[in-house]
């Protein structure tokens, strides 16, 4: 019987969001254990090699990371298989580049460049609010952070704006109707819209109804909803398309219009 952790990941079993060709070998890089789940993360190796094209091989990525050039959320990461996840900020100081990991409407991690000012903070979804030993209140975020003595108004499913350098909470956004959100799981992954209403189903999954800027409405589980702004103002910049998913016919019309303009 097998003992211990799994050390390999077959390429065919790797998440589709990594966009690995199935003829490129037998194995895929297995992410290290870290703040994000295997199916919800992107290894640093794939980000540098396949997305940014800064390296051709695994060996070259290791040489880059071992020079301590790559920072994730303000901390140097030398592990080439480190799991990057939703809202993580990747800094490459040598080239002066800053990236935020964010989904596109097709459910893939897009290369989203951000400014130096925006790279100083990130948004975190509150997963748990509890009281620890000696009555110390604390909360746990979606990326595994534990923050002690938070503002008592912050509840589960709210979003906090976290300053990366100091780990201080700058602001909080309530999970309320009318606030802007992004979907982080399910078939609507990557879509952006405003929360319309929520249905409570005790003993099952609460359902959240969302409307995007084009007027399309859809529903998803509460667990998949990540609040990213108050009202219609987003706290982070969004990738091209602003999280609006077009139908097949709308995509075709847009493509034909672009071709006609050329």
UniProtKB/Swiss-Prot annotation:
Pfam families, per the entry: 40S_S4_C, KOW, Ribosomal_S4e, RS4NT, S4
S4 RNA-binding domain location: 42-104
Superkingdom, taxonomy of origin: Eukaryota
Keyword check for rRNA-binding: yes
An example molecular function term from Gene Ontology annotations: rRNA binding
InterPro entries listed in its UniProt record: KOW, Rib_uL2_dom2, Ribosomal_eS4, Ribosomal_eS4_C, Ribosomal_eS4_central_region, Ribosomal_eS4_central_sf, Ribosomal_eS4_KOW, Ribosomal_eS4_N
Keywords from the named record: Ribonucleoprotein, Ribosomal protein, RNA-binding, rRNA-binding
Family, similarity comment: Belongs to the eukaryotic ribosomal protein eS4 family.
The protein's name: Small ribosomal subunit protein eS4
Taxonomic source organism: Lysiphlebus testaceipes
């Amino acid at each position: 019987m097998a003992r211990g952790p799994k050390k390999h990941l077959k390429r065919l079993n790797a998440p589709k969001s990594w966009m690995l060709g199935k003829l490129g070998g037998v194995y895929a890089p297995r992410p290290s254990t870290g703040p994000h789940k295997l199916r919800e993360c992107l290894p640093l190796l794939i980000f540098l090699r396949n997305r940014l094209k800064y390296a051709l091989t695994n060996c070259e990525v290791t040489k880059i990371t071992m020079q301590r050039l790559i920072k994730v959320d303000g901390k140097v990461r030398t592990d080439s298989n480190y799991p990057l996840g939703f809202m993580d900020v990747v800094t490459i100081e040598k080239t002066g580049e800053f990236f935020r990991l964010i989904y596109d409407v097709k459910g893939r991690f897009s290369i989203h460049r951000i400014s130096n000012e925006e790279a100083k903070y990130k948004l975190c979804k509150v997963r748990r609010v509890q009281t620890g030993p000696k009555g110390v209140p604390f909360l746990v975020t979606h990326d595994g952070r534990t923050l002690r003595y938070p503002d008592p108004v912050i509840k589960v499913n709210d979003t906090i704006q976290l300053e990366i350098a100091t780990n201080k909470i700058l602001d909080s956004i309530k999970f309320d109707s009318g606030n802007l959100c992004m979907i982080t799981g399910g078939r609507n992954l990557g879509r952006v819209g405003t929360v319309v209403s929520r249905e409570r189903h005790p003993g099952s999954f609460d359902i959240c109804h969302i409307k995007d800027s084009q007027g399309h409405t859809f529903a998803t589980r509460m667990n998949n909803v990540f609040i990213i702004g108050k009202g219609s103002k987003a706290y982070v910049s969004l990738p091209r398309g602003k999280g609006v998913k077009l139908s097949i016919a709308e995509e075709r019309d847009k493509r034909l219009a672009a071709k006609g303009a050329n």
